[in-house]
Every structure is written in structure tokens, then in C-alpha cells.
Amino acid sequence: MDLIAQIEAEQIAALGKDIPDFRAGDTVRVGFKVTEGTRTRVQNYEGVCIARNNGHGIAGSFTVRKISFGEGVERVFPLHSTNIESITVVRRGRVRRAKLYYLRSRRGKSARIAENTNYKPKSGASV
């Protein structure tokens, strides 16, 4: 393991976050800390993960898309952000692409993703 990867692994271990194994196509619920004035609360953001960027490293991020009041809303979350309180996998999707940007141009039933009922976690991955 080279020096940079070793430092990244130490930083990830120091954060002590338990990040579930999820990928593009999965419906996830992200508990994100929002500061309004002096108080802080947790806001849940639930939608389809359409992309994972930079893998599992310290710079990793993922994009979640949801439909809110008829408008598509996308939000990019840093994977190891201190503002993320929890990531929960609601539903496993069966897709054949790593990036689901084509969902941006789809509406209604054509934007649905089939559920993966035969999901098997990778060895050593937390569910």
C-alpha cells in the first residue's frame, strides 16, 4: 500500500462511519445535518442513487435524485462527510449501468427501476 492510500485509510478509520454497500440504482435515505440559525436538525433525503464517484476513498461522493413536487432534484453528497448522520439502503435496484444520467430525461413509469430480489452482498461488506 502506498503512502497516500495508507493516509486515506487512516483518515477513514478515524471517522468511524459505517457506510453500507450501495451502488447506482439503489434507493437510499440519507440523514443530512442541516443548520438553521443556531439549531441543527437531521433532514432525510430519499431518492435513487444515480452515480458513485471516486469509489470508497476519502474523496468519494454519490449523487441522489428524487422527484419533489413534480420537479427532479439531484444532490451530491460526499461519502465521508461529517454532516451525514446516516445512510440507509431502502431498496436494491437492478440496473446495467454505473451512471444513470439517462433517468434525467425520463418521466413517470419509464423512470422506474426494477427491484433486485437476488442481491448478495460482497464478502466483507456491511449491509
UniProtKB/Swiss-Prot annotation:
GO molecular function: structural constituent of ribosome
Any Gene Ontology biological process: translation
Record GO cellular component, one term: cytosolic large ribosomal subunit
Annotated keywords: Ribonucleoprotein, Ribosomal protein
Top-level division of the source organism's lineage: Bacteria
A Pfam family matched in the record: Ribosomal_L19
Family statement drawn from the similarity comment of this UniProt entry: Belongs to the bacterial ribosomal protein bL19 family.
Function per UniProt: This protein is located at the 30S-50S ribosomal subunit interface and may play a role in the structure and function of the aminoacyl-tRNA binding site.
Protein name per the record: Large ribosomal subunit protein bL19
Originating species: Roseobacter denitrificans (strain ATCC 33942 / OCh 114) (Erythrobacter sp. (strain OCh 114))
Phylogenetic lineage: Bacteria, Pseudomonadati, Pseudomonadota, Alphaproteobacteria, Rhodobacterales
